[in-house]
Amino acid sequence: MKVRASVKKMCEKCRVIRRRGRVMVICSNPKHKQRQG
């Protein structure tokens, strides 16, 4: 999980979602998981 000021899609499979008011990226590749914070 990477914590970043700006989250971006890193590949075609990445999905930008909102959970509990946080913007997150979920992906089949675990290296691409990101959270805004």
Swiss-Prot record:
Top-rank lineage group of the source organism: Bacteria
Q: Which SUPFAM superfamilies match?
A: Ribosomal protein L36
Q: Does the keyword Ribonucleoprotein apply?
A: yes
Q: Does the keyword Ribonucleoprotein apply?
A: yes
Q: Recorded GO terms, molecular function?
A: structural constituent of ribosome
Q: Cite the entry's keywords alphabetically.
A: Ribonucleoprotein, Ribosomal protein
The record's similarity note reads: Belongs to the bacterial ribosomal protein bL36 family.
Name of the protein in its database record: Large ribosomal subunit protein bL36
